[in-house]
Amino acid sequence: MIDVNEIEVVVCGEEHVKYIDEILKTMSDAAKVRGTGIAKRTHEYVEKVMREHKAVLALYHGRFAGFSYIESWSHRLFVTNSGLIVHPDFRGIGLASRIKRRVFALARQRYPLAKVFSLTTGAAVLNMNTKLGFKPVTFEALTSDKQFWKGCESCVNFDILQRNGGQKCLCTALLWDPAEHLDEQPVIEEKMDNQKKEIKREKVVLAYSGGLDTSFAVKYLTECGY
């Protein structure tokens, strides 16, 4: 039996693009076996989140073992933990939980003030999210960003979402609100293996104006690493 501790869970970079085809095939195969909806991701999109260091990859001596990624919505007010998948050869050893903790830590590190949410039909993912402090919510509590919901169009259950006016589907909505965890700091449970890699950021110019309190903006930008 494979020892889960021998599996690396790293933040993705350009060097991991070579694993994309296997990641997408594993996702597609899982959707067929489960018979439930999984939104399809394109090669271009997965490459984008990898190059932007918004994804985590599990590797066993160079072999693909698992994957997940984050994405921000509504001007960084929300961030998703999405696409969690474990290769069949590495299931049942606790790897999914390790990936989930790492991708949640990445979301908190990159977007410390954002609400983190997840949509899932899987009991295992629901259980992992609950242990991290996520709570079930209605779809109304999630982002209204049209680009996010457009991603659901590739799911086999999209017609159910449409029939319910975008307010109900087979997925359970789970939300982690930082306002309910003010005493908790963003903690990275495991050392980021490629933490030293430089993440390119846009330049931000903050102009002060008399009578306008911009202290909240300074705090936000500082926490985001600017």
Stretches with model-predicted labels:
Residues V86, G92-A107:
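Conserved acetyl-CoA-binding loop-helix of GNAT-fold acetyltransferases
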Residues N81, V116-L119, L206-Y208:
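Conserved hydrophobic beta-strand within the GNAT/NAT acetyltransferase core sheet
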Residues L24-P88:
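A conserved beta-strand-loop-helix scaffold within acyl/acetyltransferase catalytic domains
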Residues D193-Y226:
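ATP-dependent adenylation/nucleotidyltransferase module used to activate substrates
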Residues M1-N5, R108-M192:
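Terminal substrate-recognition subdomain of acyl/acetyltransferases
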Residues M1-H43, Q185:
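Short amphipathic alpha-helix that is part of the acyltransferase structural core
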Residues H87-D89, I93, A123, G210:
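Active-site acidic-Proline motif in GNAT/NAT acetyltransferases
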